[in-house]
Amino acid sequence: MTIDNQTGLVLEGGGMRGVFTCGVLDYLMDHDIRFPYTIGVSAGACNGLSYMSRQRGRAKYSNIDLLEKYHYIGLKHLLKKRNILDFDLLFTEFPEHILPYDYQAYFDSPERYVMVTTNCLTGEADYFEEKKDKNRVIDIVRASSSLPFVCPIAYVDGIPMLDGGIVDSIPLQ
């Protein structure tokens, strides 16, 4: 399906509300519907990465099946690691070993993808595009998902960042 250059896809955050988004993104992939511009914040940024790499089912699998298997959200993690989410599992083990992320497909995608974070120094939203450095992609999506008080501050390019949904929960930029 052809989408004009003025149309974009906005992926909001909202934690487990992102499960619905997973189904929508799988539908879009099933019908080869692509947008020239996609922007995601928090859970939307995570799910959007699977959409951009065209890994159908990956976002749903990580949000439902792997949650059930690994219990990566909860007070246990907050008390043990000062993080309600097991970020090491989510952003290292999953994409590298358990549920491999296709960075090359993402980097080769002609569509633009932007992830939103909250800059802790300015209190404003920062909008990041990264299509070359996989470590920076992980830094950005980790920052976009770092909830205040229950997740540690993340750093992108040495700048402290938190969840993009704090200041721009439905990014229409």
Provide a role label for each language-model segment.
Residues 1-41, 49-173:
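Patatin-like phospholipase
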